[in-house]
Regions:
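Cap/insert and terminal regions of metallo-dependent hydrolase folds
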Residues: 217-321
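Active-site neighborhood of phospho(di)ester-bond hydrolases with catalytic His/Asp-centered motifs
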Residues: 86-88, 110-119, 139-142, 208-212, ...
Length: 321
């Protein structure tokens, strides 16, 4: 699927990249352009920390033929007395992401981290660095020995930081409470996954953090915009979603038993009131109509792939569908 053009600012007043409200510190409101940006998804509650990367055929998360730019998304959930970072970003972006976090929370504020994909760089690359720089209260993971996964050539002090970092293991169906007011964040095993993955749902902002799913929209330029809203003329098609899925890590779905996957995803959308889908990379989907449309396209794609109607076959390395 080709890049999706922007069709104007949405009714939420977000021009997607580095646009914040007057209540946010000045340094956080200033556009960061090619160096990344901050998007306020809910004032004083949820921010997307966005840092672009080029699509030049070397990024396995996108089809080999994709050209343009995508964006790695980290998310900062904030309360007056605590904050949580979802995914820590690529190591190349560590200084920028660190500055983004510093612009949004007070020094010393308790910070928790939750990398949703334990074996993917854009999720875990900066755990050790941030644990050493911020007042990290805990790191939520699906694996109690996850600290062993976060050592990317760290020096002795880095390894000591990881050893002393508190790790909180979460189950496949759990709830985290953020801050003394107990802001509820529901944890679930991703109903569609290739690697160990969790999805989260933030009740306060009605946001589903979908990790490596719903990542199928990229742009022509590094400046985005990186949010699709109800007001946009979003040209994403079922054919485009199908091509994206079959030319990335979910190439194996054609001819697989997808009915159970469809039921799992459907249960999530039936259970939760979702106004925003916040993927780990690619454009954020914002607004009930946008969310519903992209969910339906994914469901139709999965339906067409089921073994009852499709045949599994060998796919060569360079073949695109």
């Amino acid at each position: 699927m080709g890049p999706v053009p922007f069709a104007g600012q949405g009714r939420y007043g977000l021009a997607a990249m580095a646009i914040l409200t007057q209540h946010t510190p000045r340094e956080a409101r200033e556009p960061r352009g090619f160096a990344g940006g901050i998007a306020s998804l809910a004032d004083d509650q949820l921010y997307a920390l966005q840092n672009p990367f080029a699509l030049d055929g070397r990024v396995s998360s996108y089809p080999a033929s994709a050209r343009g730019f995508a964006v790695a998304n980290s998310y900062l959930l904030t309360q007056p007395d605590a904050a949580m970072l979802i995914d820590t970003g690529f190591g190349k972006d560590e200084p920028v992401i660190r500055a983004q976090i510093e612009s949004l929370i007070a020094p010393g504020l308790p910070l928790s981290m939750f990398p949703l994909r334990l074996n993917e760089f854009m999720s875990i690359n900066n755990v050790e660095s941030f644990a050493g720089h911020f007042n990290v209260e805990t790191c939520y993971t699906s694996n109690i020995d996850a600290a062993l996964w976060f050592d990317f050539g760290a020096k002795a002090e880095g390894r000591d930081i990881l050893k002393s970092m508190k790790v909180t293991a979460v189950t496949r169906a759990d709830t985290i409470e953020l801050g003394k007011d107990g802001r509820a964040i529901d944890v679930m095993q991703a109903p569609i996954r290739l690697i160990a993955t969790r999805w989260l749902y933030d009740r306060a902002t009605r946001t589903l953090f979908s990790s490596d799913m719903f990542t199928h929209i990229w742009r022509d330029t590094a400046t985005g915009p990186w949010i699709v809203t109800d007001a946009d003329n979003d040209p994403t098609s079922l054919r485009g979603v199908r091509s994206f899925m079959l030319n990335t890590r979910y190439w194996w779905l054609e001819g697989a038993p997808t009915d159970s996957i469809r039921r799992g995803i459907g249960n999530v959308f039936d259970k939760y009131d979702i106004e925003t889908i916040a993927p780990g990379y690619g454009c954020i989907l914002r607004g009930r109509n946008v969310v519903e449309r992209h969910y339906r396209m994914l469901d139709e794609f999965l339906k067409s792939c089921d073994k009852s109607v499709a045949v599994s076959r060998y796919v060569t390395r360079d073949e695109e569908r």
